[in-house]
Amino acid sequence: MQMQPEFFEKLKPRYSNNGVFQLINTSILNAFGLNDKNRGEEMSHYYDEQPDVKSNPKRISYQIKNAQLELTTDAGVFSKDNVDFGSDLLIKTFLKEHPPGPSKTIADVGCGYGPIGLAIGKVSPHHKITMLDINNRALALAEMNKTKNQVDNVTIMESNCLSTVNHQCFDYILTNPPIRAGKDIVHRIFEQAFDRLKTTGELYVVIQKKQGMPSAKKKIEELFGNVEIIAKSKGYYILKSIKG
């Protein structure tokens, strides 16, 4: 393949205003799809009702304690290639805080194809879990994965944040929030979670520091009057708040 002169022009060294050498400029990042703005646009469909990307299903496995989940994922849903590190950390942290025991009500907000709610439901079959998402493709996958893994204690519902369950209250609400949907959506999840928790109910959030953990922590503390970092690993933080 013959490179055009314009390509080599883009590879010439660049210097910022303060004289710091810049090897790769924005045009190169754009050419290879690595610009953060482009990545944000690419990921925005995860919180759309109807993803406009072509379906391409695949199967993955996820092991938690003595439970093995076989999951179908697809293009247009979050973390289609594997259960992401943040969700895995949230699942393990929650199960450490709350080993299998008496029946509790749990909401999994932004459930995607279902790893969080299904893993907890499989390990703790006495709990009643409501899984919520706005993405119809993700919801269909979650239903398929529920059936395939015989997790009978979960209900899957279409919902923008927690709007569909405004008549219910929960003991625990868990979320790996859709960061790319924007701060307004993420903060709305926190606000509605506060309203939908029982007194002494608990909110669990996984979020990366570089993707807004400090502002999320501040917002949650404003709502709940308390927030605690109960786990952190590889830049991911688990925030916990208790409704007083």
Descriptions of predicted regions:
Residues 86-175:
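Conserved SAM/SAH cofactor-binding pocket of Class I
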Residues 120, 193-194, 220:
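Class I S-adenosylmethionine-dependent transferase superfamily signal
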Residues 187-199:
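A short glycine-rich, Lys/Arg-flanked "PGG" loop and its adjoining helix->strand segment in the class I
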Residues 208-223:
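Conserved class I S-adenosyl-L-methionine
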Residues 232-244:
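Core SAM-dependent methyltransferase catalytic element
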